[in-house]
Structures are given as C-alpha cells and as structure tokens.
C-alpha cells in the first residue's frame, strides 16, 4: 500500500546523491544489541550485524501480523495511529496502535475471518459527512471491510463482496486510490490466486444513500506471471499510479485512474532482478516515500533477506517509468511482508518520516526515515525538501 495525504498533495522524495557503498554501510549501522528494558508485551528483537534497529516495536498481536497502514491525525500528528492486520481464520483482527506501539483495545476490531491487508484513505463522503476510512480484506468471508477513522466503527453493513461469480475469490492485497481531479475513492483489490490477465479488480466506494459504504466494480486489470501470487499493492495518489508485486517476477505499474488513457496497459515492470544482485526470492511489500515536488522513493521488501530495496519514485527525465534501484537497507524485522511509510513528522522520534514494517514475531516495527536514508537519500519532513 502507499500512504495517502489528507490534502491530496503527496509527500514524495527527490534523489540527490548516487549510491555509495561506504555511505550505505555507515547508514545501516546499528547497535549490536536491542534495548533490554522493553515493557511487558513487547517482543525482543535480535538485530543482525549491520541492520537498522527500530525506534519502536509494538506490543504483540495474538496470532500473525501481516500488513500495516498509517492514519495521520488532521490537527495533531502526534495522535496519529497505525492500523495492522492479525491473520487468523476465525479470530483475526484489525489492531490499532499509537505511536508508542501500544495497542488501543477500544479501537481494535475482532473477530474477522483472516483479515489480510489494510489501507487508509481520507475524505469519503458518507451520510453527508467527510469520513476517513480504513479498509481491510477479509479473506475468509470474500469481502472487504470498511471502518471509519479514528473510531474504527463499521460503516459497510457487514462487508462488500468482491470477485463475485469467480472461482478464485479469496481477497488478499488492497490499496485505496483517491482521484485528484474529483476526490472519487477506489479500492484496488488483489486475491490469493487468479488469472493471467485481470488479476486485480477495482471498486468505486460510495454511500448507498443510507450511510453504508458499497463498492461498484469499475474494471478488471493487471497481468500475472503465475510464478507465485500477488499480495502487495500500493497507489501513488498524486501521480496516479498503482504498483503491485507479482512475486518472483517484479513490480508492475499501471494507471490507477480507470478512466485514464491507456489505463489497461502495463507501464513498467521493475524490481525484477533476482539472485546475488537482486531479490533473494520474492519481491513483497511496497511503500512510497513521497515529497511534494513529485519525486521520492519506492521501497520493496526483499522478504527472505530481511532487506528493503529502494527505487526512485519519479523515474528518469526521459522515461518516468524507469524506476532506478538506488539502495538496499537491512532491517531487524524478520520475514517482513507489508509495510507503510510517510514523510509527515508525527513526532520527534521520526523527524523526516515514519516507516512501519511487519515482523513475523507478531509485531510491527517503526523506523525513522533518517536512519533508512542515511546521507545518500533525500529527507523531506512533511514532504518538503530542506534547503
């Protein structure tokens, strides 16, 4: 998924300096051991040599973390929230955490039937009011679920059926897209398995006239290699692109606007190098560090190497779809799949942005963009490059 901005102006990042191995190693340096004074309920992390340490580790969920989303508070960023999925066939949940990693039990939603991925968006008109939303895929029910933020109240009348009349229905990945021209909000949904073409289905989210959110199918699109599966989906709202990980093949790029010229044509495939010089096995979670000038970085999880590989958001001057690899960062998350990032300054712990990644020990890890960027990537607090 990719973080949405309340104003509709994206955070993006501008690449200034080239990749330097010496700087990279320095940027990735971390203490040999994690803090030993973790509070009860917070899982310890064994930090590999040369890997980044998280600033915050959340309290443990009950079963199996998978995907986070970041909601930015409209007036006080320090009150922003992290929504994260906990997969279980019968007792899954959407957990809500504060910026200290503490579970907010009054906002956490359960039981859900294997809720897989989640995303947030701002300003959906429901019942005549502008409502921020969190939308998750409930795989066991073949539905997507819609909740208002920050209270996490159900506003979907029990869920929205997806992939109806298909044999392969089980939803997995999701990303929300807000069209800049008119504010229309869409859900782009992937599934556990699907066809070679039309793997993703896109739904327009709207009020049914009674205060419930419904989804209207507007298109089916997206190529699939058949090598593994497609889970991670991320939308760049201001630039109008959707990216998804065709695992074992690469990251595919399309127009997010279903009405755009050539909307069904693949624009690029990148992050497609595997082996010693690329991904260890599968390309997984995607997140986009956005700066307001349209530049930035696309982070892709190299899950089995416990690394994130970073690419330019804006491409090249003569080819905006040429997303160049610029850096690889080792992290202390284990087998990380879903992730999210923002350049909004939520508090002093994250002076140029917050990166959240799941770890397979039932936790989510919060990293500072300062640590990821080091000295060789651009830092843009609140989406603005500092002179």
Task: Name each model feature, range by range.
Residues 24-27:
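C-terminal motif of bacterial Sec signal peptides marking the signal peptidase cleavage site
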Residues 75, 99-102, 124-125, 147-155, ...:
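Short loop/turn segments immediately following beta-strands, especially the blade-tip
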Residues 140-185, 190-191:
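Asp-box/WD-like beta-propeller blade repeats and closely related beta-sheet repeat scaffolds
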Residues 270-284, 318-346:
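Conserved blade-ending motifs and adjacent loop-strand segments that build the rim/top face
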């Amino acid at each position: 998924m990719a973080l949405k901005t309340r104003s509709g102006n994206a955070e993006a990042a501008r690449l200034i300096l080239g990749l330097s191995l010496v700087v990279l190693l320095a940027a990735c340096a971390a203490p040999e051991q994690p803090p030993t004074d973790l509070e009860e309920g917070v899982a310890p992390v064994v930090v590999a040599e040369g890997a980044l340490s998280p600033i915050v580790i959340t309290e443990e969920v009950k079963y199996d973390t998978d995907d986070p989303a970041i909601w930015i508070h409209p007036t006080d960023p320090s009150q922003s929230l992290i929504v994260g999925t906990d997969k279980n066939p019968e007792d899954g949940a959407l957990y809500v955490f504060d910026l200290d990693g503490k579970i907010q039990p009054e906002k956490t939603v359960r039981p859900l039937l294997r809720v897989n991925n989640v995303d947030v968006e701002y300003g959906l008109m429901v019942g005549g009011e502008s409502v921020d939303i969190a939308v998750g895929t409930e795989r066991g029910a073949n539905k997507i679920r819609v909740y208002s933020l920050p209270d996490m109240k159900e506003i979907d009348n029990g869920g929205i059926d997806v992939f109806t009349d298909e044999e392969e229905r089980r939803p997995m990945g999701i990303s929300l897209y807000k069209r800049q021209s008119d504010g229309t909000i869409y859900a782009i949904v992937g599934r556990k398995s699907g066809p070679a073409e039309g793997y993703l289905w896109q739904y327009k989210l709207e009020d049914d006239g009674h205060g419930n959110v419904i989804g209207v199918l507007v298109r089916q699109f997206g190529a699939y290699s058949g090598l593994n599966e497609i889970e991670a989906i991320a939308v760049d709202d201001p630039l109008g692109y959707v990216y998804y990980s065709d695992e074992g093949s690469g990251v595919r790029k399309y127009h997010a606007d279903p009405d755009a010229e050539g909307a069904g044509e693949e624009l690029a495939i990148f992050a497609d190098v595997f082996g010693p010089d690329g991904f260890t096995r599968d390309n997984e979670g995607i997140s986009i560090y956005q700066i307001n000038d349209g530049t930035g970085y696309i982070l892709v999880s190299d899950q089995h190497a416990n690394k994130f590989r970073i690419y330019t958001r804006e491409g090249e001057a003569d080819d905006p779809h040429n997303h160049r690899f610029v850096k690889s960062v080792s992290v202390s998350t284990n087998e990380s799949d879903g992730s999210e990032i923002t350049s909004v300054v939520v508090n002093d712990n994250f002076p140029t942005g917050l990166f959240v990644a799941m770890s397979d020990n039932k936790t989510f890890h919060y990293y500072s963009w300062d640590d990821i960027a080091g000295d060789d990537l651009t830092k843009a607090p609140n989406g603005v490059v500092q002179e």
